[in-house]
Amino acid sequence: MTDATVGIVLVSHSAELAAGAAHLAAQVSGGTVTIIAAGGTDDGDLGTSAAKVERGLSEADSGAGVVVLPDLGSAVLTVRAVLEDYGDAESVLLADAPFVEGAVAATVTAAAGGDIKAVAAAAEEARHARKL
C-alpha cells in the first residue's frame, strides 16, 4: 500500500485565478494533497502555457495519478496537446468540472484517499451542488 495521493493541476488563463483556487482547495486538505496552479502564460499575460501544464503534471504526480481541471475551453486544448506527448498520459484524467467547486471537491476526495477516478468524478459531480 502506498501513501501517495492523487495530485491536482488547475489550468487557468489567469495566474491569479489558478493560485487563488489552489490556495482555497489546499485549505480543505490540510496540505495533504499536492495542488499545482498552472495559470497564465510564461510571460505573465492572460492565456495558457503548455510548459506550465507539463511542469504541473510532473510536480503533482506522487504516484497515484493527476486530475487536471481547466477553467475555459482553450485550456482544455492546451492540456490535450500536452497529453499527446506526455510520457505517462494514462495517469492523468482531465475533468469536465466547474473550476473552483471542482477543485475543492477533488481535493477533499484526494485527501480522503480516493483514487484518480473517484477524484475526477467528485470534481465533475460538483457541478450539481446547489448554492441556494
Across the structure, where does each feature detected by a protein language model lie?
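N-terminal loops that bind phosphate or other acidic moieties
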Residues: M1-L132
